[in-house]
A protein has these predicted regions:
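Short secondary-structure transition hinges
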Residues: 115-162
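Basic, helix-initiating cap at the start of DNA-binding domains
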Residues: 1-46, 50-62, 76
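Hydrophobic alpha-helical connector segments
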Residues: 80, 91-120, 173-176
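Amphipathic, non-transmembrane alpha-helical scaffold segments
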Residues: 28, 78, 82, 86, ...
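C-terminal peripheral helix-coil segments that are non-catalytic and often amphipathic
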Residues: 1-19, 152-156, 160, 192-222
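Hydrophobic alpha-helical bundle segments that form small-molecule/ligand-binding pockets
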Residues: 144-172, 176-179, 183, 187
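Short hydrophobic/aromatic patch on the recognition helix
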Residues: 61-71
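Short amphipathic alpha-helical segment with a characteristic S/N-K-E followed by hydrophobic residues
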Residues: 35, 73-79, 88
């Protein structure tokens, strides 16, 4: 076989291999996304511990081996799903913060999405997350970031005249965070509706932080 013919043959073979590799890569990428979506939906509906890896594989019509090739453990699957959720949520919050005219409009937008989110999620999902160390560490990091974001949000509210400027917001955040943890640890969401919890925890707290202008705006929301 002539030398150049061999070169052309090898080039064609290489292109075919590269195309096959790309197709496999695209397939795995799409499958990874489908696994995350299916698993997180099941976790939110039934609770994390109630959903087995076998259940996820069966729902997608794939083998357990294929599932474990992409996610070695259930914790890795959950961890990536949680990270994806937080990335999307942060992107949404950034857009809302930029698009809303004032902090009160931001509160309304976030309130609506959070209430809808809690309605669609089995409370056991939140209770189960602490059982997974990687997820718990990530959530702790996110809580620290939320702390920083909240302080900036309050500064904006002070500037706009909706929040009081004589409040220790660092302390207020610590107290609010402690109340939120109390709700979760004692599973108050099993006794009260999400609307009741938000009304009595979030809005009562916010009312104490508002100026007269802020209280009037808050009353329109509630």
């Amino acid at each position: 076989m002539p030398f150049f013919t061999i070169i052309l043959y090898l080039c064609r073979q290489n292109r075919m291999i590269m195309q096959e590799s790309k197709e496999i890569s695209d397939y795995k990428k799409n499958l990874r996304g489908s696994i995350l979506e299916t698993a997180m939906h099941a976790f939110a509906k039934k609770g994390i511990r109630a959903v087995k890896m076998d259940d996820v594989a069966a729902a997608l019509g794939i083998s357990k081996r294929t599932l474990y090739e992409i996610f070695e453990t259930k914790e890795l699957l959950l961890s990536e799903g949680i990270r994806k959720y937080y990335a999307e949520r942060q992107d949404y919050y950034r857009r809302v913060t930029q698009q809303c005219k004032n902090v009160m409009e931001v509160l309304v937008a976030i309130y609506r999405i959070k209430v809808d989110e809690f309605r669609k999620t089995n409370p056991q999902f939140y209770a189960d997350m602490d059982k997974y160390p990687k997820v718990a560490r990530f959530l702790n990091q996110q809580n620290q970031q939320t702390h920083k974001d909240m302080l900036k949000f309050m500064e904006r509210g002070i500037y706009e005249g909706y929040f009081r400027d004589d409040v220790n917001y660092e302390l207020a955040w610590l107290l609010f965070d402690a109340l939120g943890k109390y709700v979760m640890v004692n599973q108050l969401y099993r006794q009260y509706t999400i609307e009741e919890i938000f009304q009595n925890l979030v809005f009562v707290t916010m009312r104490g932080l508002c100026t007269e202008k802020g209280v009037k705006a808050l009353d329109k929301i509630v």
